[in-house]
């Protein structure tokens, strides 16, 4: 088993469909549901979207633009395999699938939907709930 450590740089909540992402200093992950007060809470495989800062920088985006919940410092999260465990603060998440680029991305930047293929982010489900705070250590275990 390999382990990688990084840290949480941003946390966002989506309070309603189509609403702007709200930056927060911390969030509460709820086992089997997602993040408290996030509209995606309760979805089975799409509870939390995680992106890394390398992806944000590579495409010249602002944090929150990809509708991500959590941004991790550095690179290498995109393409994480299903079943990978990510410990964020007090919470433990499991990678369920990579997030496919959608039409919304071309509204942000022409061609982004095609360009970001394979780097859109990683969707997770919450295995163990807990508080997640900006600056917390993130431990990724394959």
Feature annotation, model-predicted:
Residues 1-142:
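Metal-cofactor-dependent catalytic cores
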